[in-house]
Amino acid sequence: MAVQQNKKTPSKRGMHRSHDFLVAPQLSVEPTTGETHMRHHISPNGFYRGRKVLKTKNDE
């Protein structure tokens, strides 16, 4: 079984874990409706990059 030879300092421990953080999702604002949505995803009402790309139940 592997056993460390020397204790890892708090600084080295932090450097080792430097990329283990959680990233908040990138959000965009839809220009036509002003709704917030995740990047590269359609908004809840069916708009993507200013165009209607999906029919929703509320559409006539």
Swiss-Prot record:
Region Disordered: start-end pairs: 1-60
A Gene Ontology BP annotation from the UniProt entry: translation
Record Pfam families: Ribosomal_L32p
Comp. bias regions, Basic residues: 49-60
Domain of life: Bacteria
GO CC annotations, alphabetized: large ribosomal subunit
Keywords of the record: Ribonucleoprotein, Ribosomal protein
Protein name from the UniProt record: Large ribosomal subunit protein bL32
Family per similarity comment: Belongs to the bacterial ribosomal protein bL32 family.
InterPro entries: Ribosomal_bL32 (IPR002677), Ribosomal_bL32_bact (IPR044957), Ribosomal_zn-bd (IPR011332)
Molecular functions (GO terms): structural constituent of ribosome
Native organism taxonomy: Bacteria, Pseudomonadati, Pseudomonadota, Betaproteobacteria, Burkholderiales
